[in-house]
Every structure is written in C-alpha cells, then in structure tokens.
Amino acid sequence: MGIFRLAFLYTVIILTGMNILNHIAELSRSNWSPVLADQYSSWHHEVLLETWRDFADIQDHYAEAECKKPGRVMFHILKKKAVIYVHVEYAIGWVYVRFVGSNEEFVEFLKQEKEVA
C-alpha cells in the first residue's frame, strides 16, 4: 500500500471519526444517555482496527449487521435501540459513516435519502 493511499485513508478515517465524535457530543447534550454515546465511541474504535474485504468479514465480528444494498451496512447497537449506517468501500478499505442515531431518526434519514435520489 502506497504512502499516499495510507495518508489519504488516515485522513478519511480521522474526518469520519471527528463527525462521530461531534455527534457523540450532541447526543450527550440531548436526552440520550451517556451509555449510548459510549457505544458509538466503542464501535468507532473497533472499526479503526478492522480490515474488511467483504460483508462476511463484517458478520464474523458483528453478527447482527445487515447488508442493505451492495456496500451499505447497518449496525445495530444497544440492543437495537440505535443504528450506525455506513458505506463500505471494500476494495480500498474505507468506511464512510452515513448515519448515526435512533431507529426513528434512521427511518427519517432513509425517507430524505430517497427524496434526494
């Protein structure tokens, strides 16, 4: 793997991480519990250490993960009370976080995404 690709990958992961950390801060200020914010942080830390080549690699570690369409994966956390929805580029090892929030917020997100498409 080339230096440029590593640097670019690192930048994407860090920026994604910053978005998650900002969202965690928002959750902490809202009516969500600190336990839920901790779950987001834990998931993010685990993903930084993973190398996924396909959806089967994800399911080896996250049995309840769902493949919504090619490259789109939904993770359930906190006993399915919340969702992390990502786009995975398996060939280059990138994970783009598209949504973090409650199940109700996720339904609204999907409606908005369909309107835009």
What are these regions (language model features)?
Residues 1-81, 89-96, 103-117:
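Basic, Lys/Arg-enriched alpha-helical interface segments
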